[in-house]
């Protein structure tokens, strides 16, 4: 069994990680930490996990205890993994970080977007960006994995086939994305209150969202050149889900885009290219580690529209983290992740 530690188990990504690992046949959660909830039983905080983690209680983070684990997940706000990851890596423990701490390869760029100096720039050379559909082989050999964000996952998977094939104009990319309220986290905030978010929808961070440099970094690598991306996120009155509507222009309108996408993702267990003309729904991926994609070329012109949907807490966070765990430890990539989307 893989001995697992979790730092920061009280947020939405933390409890989703617990839910997924409870059904994983090769992983056992041995340590879970929370400074604010130390001493509280996991089953008392999350009744849905009763019978799965009996006897497991939250504890104050301790590097020695965490260092005895085979792998430690960080489901924490940015900056926390900076302080602990180095010590764990020195102890031989693998680190899978769900926060943004090691996603950007440029420490100065990270500091610009997150409002503080990068706390562990020396570790960036060891960090592997954990998008399996791009970096599977690097993940197998990794010590430190940076799990992609939710918007970046849906957006990159939607644009990748076009950019890798050199079909899309990389200077004219648009990502119009919608997120459920759980993407804002579990902390109390006026904008996340039911009376504020219910029956309403709004754009936010149009001037610049923290996920913009992460998305641009990935698309730049796919295109092999700089990209021009306009990214506009929106908050919608649902709990889970990301719906990304992506726009790109192509010079060659004779290419069979459906075939291109189907070929690119033919061997990817968690990317579902839907039949031509489809419109994927966020509810179809609720609770599932799946990205569903449909590609359109309206009126047969040079504008391509890609629709990409994920569950922000699963393929956009904790499910992708478990997918990385499976790859890292040489397991079947689908282990513990075979859940169908929850309907209705």
Curated annotation (Swiss-Prot):
Q: One biological-process term from Gene Ontology?
A: L-arginine biosynthetic process
Protein family (similarity comment): Belongs to the NAGSA dehydrogenase family. Type 1 subfamily.
Q: Which UniProt keywords apply?
A: Amino-acid biosynthesis, Arginine biosynthesis, Cytoplasm, NADP, Oxidoreductase
Which residues of this protein are catalytic? 150
This entry's Gene Ontology molecular function terms read: N-acetyl-gamma-glutamyl-phosphate reductase activity; NAD binding; NADP+ binding
This protein's name:
N-acetyl-gamma-glutamyl-phosphate reductase
Specify whether Amino-acid biosynthesis is a keyword of the entry: yes
Q: In which pathway does it act?
A: Amino-acid biosynthesis; L-arginine biosynthesis; N(2)-acetyl-L-ornithine from L-glutamate: step 3/4
Sum up the protein's function in the record's words: Catalyzes the NADPH-dependent reduction of N-acetyl-5-glutamyl phosphate to yield N-acetyl-L-glutamate 5-semialdehyde.
GO CC terms, sorted: cytoplasm
Origin species, per record, is Pseudomonas entomophila (strain L48)
Q: Which InterPro entries match?
A: AGPR_AS, AGPR_type-1, NAD(P)-bd_dom_sf, NAGSA_dehydrogenase, Semialdehyde_DH_NAD-bd
Gene coding for it: argC
What is this enzyme's EC? 1.2.1.38
Report which superkingdom the organism of origin falls in.
Bacteria
């Amino acid at each position: 069994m893989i001995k697992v530690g979790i730092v920061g188990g009280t947020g939405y990504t933390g409890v989703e990680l617990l839910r997924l690992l409870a059904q994983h046949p090769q992983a056992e959660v041995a340590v879970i930490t929370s400074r604010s909830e130390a001493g509280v039983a996991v089953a008392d905080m999350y009744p849905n996990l009763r019978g799965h983690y009996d006897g497991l209680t939250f504890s104050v983070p301790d590097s020695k205890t965490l260092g005895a684990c085979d792998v430690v997940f960080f489901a924490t706000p940015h900056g926390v993994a900076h302080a602990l990851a180095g010590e764990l890596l020195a102890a031989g423990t693998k680190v899978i970080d769900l926060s943004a701490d090691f996603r950007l390869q440029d420490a100065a760029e990270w500091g610009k977007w997150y409002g503080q100096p990068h706390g562990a720039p020396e570790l960036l050379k060891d960090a592997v960006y954990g998008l399996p559909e791009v970096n599977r082989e690097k993940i197998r050999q990794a010590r430190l994995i940076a799990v992609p964000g939710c918007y970046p996952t849906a957006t990159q998977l939607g644009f990748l086939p076009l950019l890798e094939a050199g079909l899309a104009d990389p200077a004219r990319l648009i990502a119009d994305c919608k997120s459920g309220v759980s993407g804002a986290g579990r902390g109390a905030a006026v904008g996340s209150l039911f009376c504020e978010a219910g029956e309403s929808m709004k754009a936010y961070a149009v001037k610049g969202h923290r996920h913009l440099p992460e998305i641009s970094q990935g698309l730049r690598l796919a295109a092999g050149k700089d990209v021009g991306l306009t990214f506009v996120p929106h908050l919608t009155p649902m709990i889970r889900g990301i719906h990304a509507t992506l726009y790109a222009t192509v010079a060659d309108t004779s290419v069979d885009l459906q075939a291109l996408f189907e070929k690119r993702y033919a061997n990817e267990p968690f990317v579902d290219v839907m039949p031509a003309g489809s419109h994927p729904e966020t509810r179809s991926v609720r609770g599932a580690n799946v990205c569903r994609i449909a590609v359109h070329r309206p009126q047969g012109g040079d504008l391509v529209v890609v629709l990409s949907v994920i569950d922000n807490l699963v393929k956009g966070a904790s499910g992708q983290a478990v997918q990385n765990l499976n790859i890292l430890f040489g397991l079947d990539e689908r282990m513990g992740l075979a859940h169908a989307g929850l309907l209705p």
